[in-house]
Amino acid sequence: MTSPRRLLFVVNNPAFFLSHRLPLAEAARADGYEVHVATMDGPSVPDIVARGFAHHVIPMTRSGKQPLQELRSVWALVRLFRRLRPGLVHLVTIKPVLYGGIAARLAGVPAMVAAISGLGFVFVAGGLKARLLRAAVGRLYRLALGHRNSRIVFQNTADRDVLARLGAVRAEQVVMIRGSGVDLGQYRVVPEPAAPVTALMAARLLRDKGVREFVEAARLLRQRGLSVRM
């Protein structure tokens, strides 16, 4: 029997769950939910279990592109959803949203939340390969986000507008937030240091993460004689 108070988080990387969704999972548990976590295997799994959450390993890779492996991931999620019968699944990051959304519909999960903080390189890259991938991924998003009882959480309007143009989201599904937030109990506000201003790019050094734009901003600031350290 489906339990309306059974909540399953699906995240690709166990370390990402701890860094980005742990407070939410703990708050849900404090509110009376039976919280489960599904991720791929990794060294952070024991930390999740040690915090009292039921953990389930799913066969998923962050960047794998082998069709049979990807289908295996979808089917593993379908079986997990049918076995656990959660009342709500919370899907985080690209593959869990795509595969978990499809699996939730196939397994008859009553409610779904999909958290989208970015759409990946497919939607920013150029060339024929990227265009073909965009078409395929667009169809997957329409399938994954077509759940009748769902909310799609966005952190920026650009991602929302892309998926809206694809016909993947309905206006009543959309929830906008300003970001994942910061735990001020761990990261306290401190006074701003004296000049010069220091700007830090907190991202992987990839083209689609904005490295070129960051370098260009540094060039323009230097050209204008502004005292900013990048």
Q: Which residue ranges define each predicted feature?
A:
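Nucleotide-sugar donor phosphate/pyrophosphate-binding loop at the beta->alpha transition
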Residues: 19-20, 68-75, 110-113, 121-144, ...
